[in-house]
Amino acid sequence: MTTPLTLENISQAPKALLHDHLDGGLRPSTVLELAGQYGYDDLPADDVDELATFFRTAAHSGSLVRYLEPFAHTVGVMQTAEALHRVAFECVEDLAGDNVVYAEVRFAPELHIEGGMGLDAVVDAVLAGFADGEKAAASAGRTITVRCLVTAMRHAARSREIAELAIRFRDRGVVGFDIAGAEAGYPPTRHLDAFEYMRGNNARFTIHAGEAFGLPSIHEAIAFCGADRLGHGVRIVDDITVAPDGQVKLGRLAAILRDKRIPLELCPSSNVQTGAVASIAEHPFDLLARTRFRVTVNTDNRLMSDTTMSQEMLRLVEAFGYGWSDLARFTINAMKSSFIPFDERLALIDDVIKPRYAVLAG
């Protein structure tokens, strides 16, 4: 018998998450406590519920630039090794509680040195938090693997330095590199040196592209930078035409994106908040899934979007009528697209994801 697709049941399904920002996933209570501990006085509220409402409301801005503004508060309380360790630990705890079995969590080390820490110390603290979180989850009967992507800010000029950081930590839990931040005026090609360095070291990277900006951002990320994955990439829909009879025609950029199986790290709720799409029902996720792009489901910023992987999946189920086999496919897509070794990916797919979805599908 097929298990009903409720939030409770979806929460029991194994999930793989590729696009989640550490500084966008703090618990509101943790933000308050860290602010008190470290003397951060700029929070807009001193009540947990009011603070949660602030982050959620501020994120529903219709603009990527305005969506990013509340991050000043989360980053502001993440300036010590102890704070970074705690946030990383709780991140793993929260993801494991949602039955995420694999996650790549990203953050920008350059944003966490205001308290005097060096970049290496910042990464060390986060990786230690992830490792301790994994152990705690295992002790609670929930197995999860969390790896790290280090991100460079696209408006800054430290991307080569951050790419070198990724390579230094590649055997200690960092599996890739990313650039993030406001897209308009800061094309991916500003950071070619960093991407060339990653390729020269046989390393993997994803690029935020096609979120607030359009097709040129995606084209640069693929054609000139050589991205292994696209962070968001939702604007690829602008290169797809659907005729009145339902026939779908791909433009050349969309075609090569699909043909090369370049994964899309789609974040439905976040895309609505930033104005990239009007609503979940109007999100191109389903069009992209039906035309066999490699789509994945992601949270982006769990605090700002007040979301979990289970909630993202449920919203897609409600909008597009997906079943367990669809959710399994999206999860396998993510696992196939992860930056860990092939045999580790395969083990999670064959030993964890497929068997558990088979039970749910009846």
UniProtKB/Swiss-Prot annotation:
Top-level taxon of the source organism: Bacteria
Keywords recorded for this protein, A-Z: Hydrolase, Metal-binding, Nucleotide metabolism, Zinc
Entry annotated with the keyword Metal-binding: yes
Pfam family, one: A_deaminase
InterPro entries referenced in this protein's UniProt entry, alphabetically: A_deaminase, A_deaminase_dom, Ado/ade_deaminase, Metal_Hydrolase
Catalytic-site annotation from UniProt: E211
Reactions that this protein is recorded to catalyse: adenosine + H2O + H(+) = inosine + NH4(+); 2'-deoxyadenosine + H2O + H(+) = 2'-deoxyinosine + NH4(+)
Co-factor note (free text): Binds 1 zinc ion per subunit.
Function: Catalyzes the hydrolytic deamination of adenosine and 2-deoxyadenosine.
This protein's name: Adenosine deaminase
Biological source species: Mycobacterium sp. (strain JLS)
